[in-house]
Amino acid sequence: MSNSNIDNDPAKIDSLLKKAKSKKIPVTYDDINKALPLNKNPSIRQLEEAILKFSDAGVDILESNEDDEIKLDIGMDEEFKLSTNVDNESEDEVEEENIGSTDDPVRLYLKDMGGVDLLTRENEVEIAKRIEEGRKTMTASLCRSPIAMRCFIVWYEDLVNEKMLLRDLIDLEANMLHDEVHENDEEHNSETEVEEHEDNHLSMSRVETQILHNIIDRMKKISFICEELLIEAKKCYEESFEPKVLQNSKKYNNNLELLINEVSEIHFNSKRTEEILGKMYGINRDLINKETAFLKLAEKYGVTRQNFLDEYIGSVINAAWKEKMLKNKKVAWKELITKESDYIDQMINELSVIESNTGLLVNDFKKLVNTIQKSERQTLQAKKDMIEANLRLVISIAKKYANRGLQFLDLIQEGNIGLMKAVDKFEYRRGYKFSTYATWWIRQAITRAIADQARTIRIPVHMIETINKILRTSRQMLNELGYEPTATEIANRLSMPLDKVRKVMKIAKEPISLENPVGDDSDGGQLGDFIEDKNAVAPIDAAIQSNLREVTTRVLATLTPREERVLRMRFGIGMNTDHTLEEVGQQFKVTRERIRQIESKALRKLQHPIRSKKLNSFRNGGKRGDGNPSDLLEA
């Protein structure tokens, strides 16, 4: 069957969509591919727009399944069958088509992305609550750890003593941009965003100055609470060593609640959180290694794994536990404790050191780490769900920034980074949809990347901002004046030094590749072919010099060998340099005067019309204009 009527039929996608919606059945990626032009591979833009069209309409897009034979009765061509069996094609052709469809990374990305359902407003709120719950649990758990308390105290001291920058402690971007995201038209001019984006970036330092004192005051309060908690915890463990005593302490619980509330109000830098988690996870790994080694040792003495866990888990491993296990009814335990007494004593000491470093009993510390890890997994999974459901939004925004200096995949990657930031900072209680909030962050990430990476010669972002400001002013003045403004006029309008304006306008010029084609024809050549090489010898000059050498050689050959040799040495003809009368005299073992006489005689011979007329054309050509025949020989 001919495909000529299908290739250019713009209604095929709409017809497929209409039938799928009316019959409430899904489509596959093969169906979409078949509905696109078949005379050539569909472009990324066509495929992406088709997938977004079906997704926005609520039609499910399924993976291709060779066992399914679901068909749509649309009364048109067989091309709309959802069956993956392709008629009238050889197996080799089918295999080549499948390979081609999975080779393109963009197509693979779009295919995987299309398999994730879009979120409703309720779904977004539900996921946001999961993220919030995970964060609350993690914050509360971290605040219960003396390790975190000590970190808070150190951070405050470093901040006050100017050993740490504020941006290294908190997420400045979240504090600065939190109130700047408003509902705006998605068709906002993307070029204007690129120009205005840097103003926000440059204000980061101003925001740091503005909120520094507020953060210092808050960290001072956190540091004071942590010191109170550490003192009370130390006192409790020294006196009773019973966790329940501390848990029942009203003062301790009140201070702990205050600490959790204060820490929750600060958006700490992710590196700071990772610093605390890294310390706790490192100690936990050390504990697991020690327990694993102890378990293997116990199994050698016949202690079963389950019995070991029953006796070990939940117990405080100390001298009292050792005495208790000596009285155990199981012979294996008695043998283990008796023969490995030194090993167990060493382990008890090591666990005691860990308890001292963590400020918690080993069992309490392990429970705390498990709670943190569980909340971290919960938060990461919720973020993953939110990100995957909004990948289409990134593509729809990235399309608007095509041909701006970055490839489409790079735009998607940068947009995805912005999407992840949006997920981290989204607050569902403000009432706006996540897509509205995320759009700003995605655009911000893409425009930042374009400003930072698009140019062949990288220019700092602050200079990009100045360039955009001058270009924007230049366009405004062009509309007002009717002609291109001069650098002086722009400098006066912006109250900027003239030298700086000229420098910026010079920097603003985009470099051009020497391999750019010239003309519409394939034989037009490249731009580099038309650039003058000032060091290269012109072809006509090279031809003249070559001819001059040949004529000079023939003319000198009419002299005696001695005269020819003297002239060549004196004027450097065919040699690297010329020679003095004394140097030539030493060569011929005669005096300087004799060489001068030979030279004069040879030059008089060259002035004879028979010889000189052969050289006159070179002299008249203006290469050597003083008329001296000897000058003509210097070539």
From Swiss-Prot:
<dbReference type="InterPro" id="IPR036388">
    <property type="entry name" value="WH-like_DNA-bd_sf"/>
</dbReference>
<keyword id="KW-0963">Cytoplasm</keyword>
<dbReference type="InterPro" id="IPR050239">
    <property type="entry name" value="Sigma-70_RNA_pol_init_factors"/>
</dbReference>
<dbReference type="InterPro" id="IPR000943">
    <property type="entry name" value="RNA_pol_sigma70"/>
</dbReference>
<dbReference type="InterPro" id="IPR042189">
    <property type="entry name" value="RNA_pol_sigma_70_r1_1_sf"/>
</dbReference>
<dbReference type="Pfam" id="PF04539">
    <property type="entry name" value="Sigma70_r3"/>
</dbReference>
<dbReference type="InterPro" id="IPR009042">
    <property type="entry name" value="RNA_pol_sigma70_r1_2"/>
</dbReference>
<dbReference type="GO" id="GO:0005737">
    <property type="term" value="C:cytoplasm"/>
</dbReference>
<feature type="DNA-binding region" description="H-T-H motif">
    <location>
        <begin position="581"/>
        <end position="600"/>
    </location>
</feature>
<dbReference type="Pfam" id="PF04542">
    <property type="entry name" value="Sigma70_r2"/>
</dbReference>
<feature type="short sequence motif" description="Interaction with polymerase core subunit RpoC">
    <location>
        <begin position="410"/>
        <end position="413"/>
    </location>
</feature>
<dbReference type="InterPro" id="IPR012760">
    <property type="entry name" value="RNA_pol_sigma_RpoD_C"/>
</dbReference>
<dbReference type="Pfam" id="PF03979">
    <property type="entry name" value="Sigma70_r1_1"/>
</dbReference>
<dbReference type="GO" id="GO:0003677">
    <property type="term" value="F:DNA binding"/>
</dbReference>
<keyword id="KW-0731">Sigma factor</keyword>
<feature type="region of interest" description="Disordered">
    <location>
        <begin position="182"/>
        <end position="202"/>
    </location>
</feature>
<feature type="compositionally biased region" description="Basic and acidic residues">
    <location>
        <begin position="182"/>
        <end position="191"/>
    </location>
</feature>
<feature type="region of interest" description="Sigma-70 factor domain-4">
    <location>
        <begin position="555"/>
        <end position="608"/>
    </location>
</feature>
<dbReference type="InterPro" id="IPR007627">
    <property type="entry name" value="RNA_pol_sigma70_r2"/>
</dbReference>
<dbReference type="InterPro" id="IPR007631">
    <property type="entry name" value="RNA_pol_sigma_70_non-ess"/>
</dbReference>
<feature type="region of interest" description="Disordered">
    <location>
        <begin position="610"/>
        <end position="635"/>
    </location>
</feature>
<dbReference type="Pfam" id="PF00140">
    <property type="entry name" value="Sigma70_r1_2"/>
</dbReference>
<keyword id="KW-0804">Transcription</keyword>
<dbReference type="InterPro" id="IPR014284">
    <property type="entry name" value="RNA_pol_sigma-70_dom"/>
</dbReference>
<comment type="function">
    <text>Sigma factors are initiation factors that promote the attachment of RNA polymerase to specific initiation sites and are then released. This sigma factor is the primary sigma factor during exponential growth.</text>
</comment>
<dbReference type="InterPro" id="IPR013325">
    <property type="entry name" value="RNA_pol_sigma_r2"/>
</dbReference>
<dbReference type="InterPro" id="IPR007624">
    <property type="entry name" value="RNA_pol_sigma70_r3"/>
</dbReference>
<dbReference type="InterPro" id="IPR007630">
    <property type="entry name" value="RNA_pol_sigma70_r4"/>
</dbReference>
<comment type="subunit">
    <text>Interacts transiently with the RNA polymerase catalytic core.</text>
</comment>
<dbReference type="InterPro" id="IPR013324">
    <property type="entry name" value="RNA_pol_sigma_r3/r4-like"/>
</dbReference>
<dbReference type="Pfam" id="PF04545">
    <property type="entry name" value="Sigma70_r4"/>
</dbReference>
<dbReference type="Pfam" id="PF04546">
    <property type="entry name" value="Sigma70_ner"/>
</dbReference>
<dbReference type="InterPro" id="IPR007127">
    <property type="entry name" value="RNA_pol_sigma_70_r1_1"/>
</dbReference>
<dbReference type="InterPro" id="IPR028630">
    <property type="entry name" value="Sigma70_RpoD"/>
</dbReference>
<dbReference type="GO" id="GO:0006352">
    <property type="term" value="P:DNA-templated transcription initiation"/>
</dbReference>
<feature type="region of interest" description="Sigma-70 factor domain-3">
    <location>
        <begin position="465"/>
        <end position="542"/>
    </location>
</feature>
<feature type="region of interest" description="Sigma-70 factor domain-2">
    <location>
        <begin position="386"/>
        <end position="456"/>
    </location>
</feature>
<keyword id="KW-0805">Transcription regulation</keyword>
<dbReference type="GO" id="GO:0016987">
    <property type="term" value="F:sigma factor activity"/>
</dbReference>
<comment type="similarity">
    <text>Belongs to the sigma-70 factor family. RpoD/SigA subfamily.</text>
</comment>
<keyword id="KW-0238">DNA-binding</keyword>
<protein>
    <recommendedName>
        <fullName>RNA polymerase sigma factor RpoD</fullName>
    </recommendedName>
</protein>
